[in-house]
């Protein structure tokens, strides 16, 4: 009531001033109309709260023993994952330089020859290597799930190291690395277990690489040789190392599908060829070049993929004849004359070997001498005039699959 009186007096005082006070009066009136609320003591309030909680459904609480038991089960399940994989691995800590050190050294040919180790990257190469019997020494991986991709018995004796994917990406030569890098003992072609499907389709066809120095070309040539069913690939001294990482990537596992024998002298090349094998040369010589003379340039294609010392050469159908003023010298170059024929003519009716020369240095004189000794020929692939020689990998693929076709047709006629 006192509040109402104060509001009325205030309204009377402010009314002459022209101010509105209806809102204040109504507020006080509403305050008088409220129903009183019973005030509960603290004890009664606590008793009502307990009654409400008593009416709620009770949920069983885990005892301390049950809590410890459940934690033990979770820990046991985490520990059983390692025995399920049947091998242990270690996690590389930040600052671990084992990956960078091993990868850097393994990319060196001197290290590969001295320590007998090679670097393989990617699931495909690792799988082919393990299936062929290659010995895995160290495996770097970025995810534990990757270990399930390989047979457990092949990983038991290896050193397994889990590293960050960013580290693999830094040291990988691949644009999109898969997170797998392995260090293997350098495989021996005599101890490798080649796939049964590969050996079943092997033909009496060999490939000799002479001065192939481009890693991509050599890898592609090895892949073509495996696809054509060659029984072996011989690499003479001067070729790029077959276990170079770029060669391995371009080969797509061909190293583990057929014997690849490296660093051979021409004197021992015939020891790796079966008796009666004819040697044919992939040559850029064309019959329409008869009696054309010119200075020998550094391009092998200018004189039929045959690399010689710079001097003038007379190119004829019978062969390459030197017209140098130094003919009377003791070191006069002898280039054997070999018959030339088109690659699609009949030439692969018996065991044969094809020699592919590099694009820069071409065929060596030793290859011509070997072909002459085995009654071989020069095989040329017709191309449009004034076009440079074909890529060595392309020429190899054309001749290999043509040889495969002719050998298979001969075998069908005999059967």
Curated annotation (Swiss-Prot):
It is found in: Mitochondrion. It comes from the Eukaryota. It holds the Pfam family MRM3-like_sub_bind. Keywords: Methyltransferase, Mitochondrion, rRNA processing, S-adenosyl-L-methionine, Transferase, Transit peptide. One of its GO terms (molecular function) is RNA binding. Its EC number is 2.1.1.-. S-adenosyl-L-methionine-dependent 2'-O-ribose methyltransferase that catalyzes the formation of 2'-O-methylguanosine at position 1370 (Gm1370) in the mitochondrial large subunit ribosomal RNA (mtLSU rRNA), a conserved modification in the peptidyl transferase domain of the mtLSU rRNA. Also required for formation of 2'-O-methyluridine at position 1369 (Um1369) mediated by MRM2. This is rRNA methyltransferase 3, mitochondrial.
């Amino acid at each position: 009531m006192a509040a109402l009186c104060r509001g009325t007096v205030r309204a009377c005082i402010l009314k002459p001033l022209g101010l509105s006070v209806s809102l204040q009066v109504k507020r006080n009136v509403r305050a008088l109309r409220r129903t009183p609320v019973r005030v509960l003591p603290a004890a009664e309030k606590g008793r009502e709260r307990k009654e409400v909680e008593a009416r709620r459904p009770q949920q069983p609480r885990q005892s301390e023993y049950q809590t410890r038991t459940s934690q033990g089960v979770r820990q046991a399940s985490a520990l059983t994952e390692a025995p399920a994989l049947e091998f242990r691995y270690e996690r590389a800590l930040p600052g671990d330089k084992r990956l960078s050190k091993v990868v850097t050294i393994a990319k060196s040919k001197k290290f590969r020859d001295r320590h007998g180790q090679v670097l393989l990257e990617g699931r495909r190469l690792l799988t082919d290597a393990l299936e062929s019997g290659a010995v895995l020494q160290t495996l770097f991986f970025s995810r534990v799930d990757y270990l399930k991709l390989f047979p457990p018995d092949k990983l038991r004796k290896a050193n397994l190291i889990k590293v960050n994917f960013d580290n693999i990406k830094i040291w990988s030569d691949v644009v999109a690395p898969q997170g797998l890098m392995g260090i293997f003992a350098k495989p021996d072609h005599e101890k490798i277990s080649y796939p049964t499907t590969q050996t079943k389709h092997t033909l009496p066809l060999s490939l000799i690489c002479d001065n192939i120095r481009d890693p991509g070309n050599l890898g592609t040539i090895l892949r073509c040789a495996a696809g054509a069913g060659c029984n072996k690939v011989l690499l003479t001294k001067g070729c790029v190392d077959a276990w170079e990482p770029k060669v391995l990537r371009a080969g797509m596992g061909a190293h583990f599908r057929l014997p690849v024998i490296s660093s051979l002298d021409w004197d021992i090349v015939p020891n790796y060829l079966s008796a009666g094998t004819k040697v044919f040369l992939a040559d850029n010589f064309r019959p329409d070049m008869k009696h054309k003379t010119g200075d020998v340039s550094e391009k092998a294609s200018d004189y039929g993929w045959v690399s010689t010392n710079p001097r003038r050469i007379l190119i004829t159908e019978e062969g390459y004849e030197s017209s140098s003023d130094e003919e009377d010298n003791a070191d006069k170059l002898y280039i054997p004359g070999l018959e030339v024929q088109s690659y699609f003519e009949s030439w692969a009716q018996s065991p044969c070997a094809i020699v592919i020369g590099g694009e820069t240095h071409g065929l060596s004189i030793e290859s011509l001498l070997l072909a002459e000794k085995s009654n071989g020929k020069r095989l040329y692939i017709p191309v449009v005039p004034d076009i440079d020689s074909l890529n060595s990998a392309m020429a190899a693929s054309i001749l290999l699959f043509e040889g495969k076709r002719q050998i298979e047709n001969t075998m069908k006629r005999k059967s």
